[in-house]
Amino acid sequence: MILYEYPFNERIRTLLRLEDLFERFAFFLAQEDPREHHVALTTLFEIAEVTGRADLKSDLMKELERQRQTLAPFRGNPGIEQNALEAVLGEIEQTLANLAQMQGKTGQHLVDNEWLASIRSRAVIPGGTCKFDLPSYYAWQQWPAEQRRQDIAKWIMPLLPLRDAAAIVLRLARESGQASKVMAMQGSYQQMLSGRSYQLMQVRVPPELRVIPEASANKYMLWVRFTMQDGDVRPRAVDIDVPFHLTLCNL
């Protein structure tokens, strides 16, 4: 099944973007070629841009604290797997402590590093990081891969508590949902939400159908419409019945 996820609010949308950026960063950092490490570095700049929101850290701390207060009363409950509960609570408490230790403006260490700031300013220009534009950066790219990797890992380190916090919040949200099998009649599906508030919608479709879900929602109803794309033309609505799995997640 192919999984599509749709956020219901700006906070989850931001966390999904962060998750995607950190996954891309980890992939390219693990590679060897200087061009791949260039992608890792420019992705680091994107992460800094997203995490630079003034309220992101406080939002994450509030949500983690809320989850801690929700889960803590289940300690000692015989109906709850205590080892799993303690693992989650320990992870939350450690991440809260790491967030609390973050000092100053998020990503300021990248701004204060003049060399990185010069690369960052050139990276937004198409072809702006050529060897004649940034000879010192080109020289750094000739260093051994492990040394470059250590440098980039050092620069991402102050942002890792935000990665860990986002991962916990998204995991708890995803685990809160229960998948149901539904059918989009002639490619369209609607469901009343009865005023319930959700954070995230997941749509899983069989890959062999080659359909693409487009989703929208408000506090009363959600819509899922399926399209299909042939080659490089614009996707078109389908008129076939589409079976899929729908999961609504709420923290």
UniProtKB/Swiss-Prot annotation:
List S-S links within the chain.
none
SUPFAM superfamilies documented for this protein = YacF-like
What are the UniProt keywords, alphabetically? Cell cycle, Cell division, Cytoplasm, Septation
Superkingdom = Bacteria
Which compartment or compartments is the protein found in? Cytoplasm
GO CC aspect terms = cell division site; cytoplasm
Q: Which InterPro entries match?
A: ZapD (IPR009777), ZapD_C (IPR027462), ZapD_sf (IPR036268)
Return one Gene Ontology term, BP aspect.
Answer: FtsZ-dependent cytokinesis
So what family is this one in? Belongs to the ZapD family.
Assembly information from the UniProt record: Interacts with FtsZ.
**What is this protein's function?**
Cell division factor that enhances FtsZ-ring assembly. Directly interacts with FtsZ and promotes bundling of FtsZ protofilaments, with a reduction in FtsZ GTPase activity.
Q: What's the protein here called?
A: Cell division protein ZapD
